[in-house]
Amino acid sequence: MRIACLLASVLMLVAVAPAGENPAPSSSMRQELENVARVGSVMVDGDVCQKIVTPLAKEYMFKVDPKDPWLAGDNYDVDDVAFNTTKKTLARLSHLTSFPSDVNLWMPIDGHPGKIQMVIRNKNEMSQFWRWGDLYQDMLPSMETVLRTGQRVTVADRPGWISVLAPVYNSLGDIVGLIEAVSRDKMDAHENVK
């Protein structure tokens, strides 16, 4: 009888507990990623980001040689100090979440409107947008919105994925890129292990 009474009491407490106290994982995940993107927008140095891709890499990015289909990739080069400094900042930002996440850097390509490049991806190699092996790709409307307006945009186009895009500013206040704070509902730790 005591057990039945105790069980009934517990069930009543669960039934009347406010629903807002324990948000759904996707709601919690979205909020944490929005916070990371907000902080990252202030912490990532746009002046340093603009130095990452070297002039040589920019020169060869759109060159096509029928004798060398990997010309652009073979000549991709970065400024080590700028790259490592920014990558460490992005990695630290990803540790602000209570779940596995990544913070990636995307930069528009000067002289090629509508094109964007993932300059740095992080340890889990998660991105809702990046196509493996591509040096650059067409800019998505959500990315254009961030680069044009400076507003953060949350994207959940792929099932189970959440990305929050936020602007990266240089010292003049210009938007020079964007970060993608990203995670997914079910993470497979071995998915990207080659």
Language model segments and positions:
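Juxtamembrane extracytoplasmic/periplasmic/luminal helical "stalk" adjacent to the first N-terminal
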Residues: 17-70
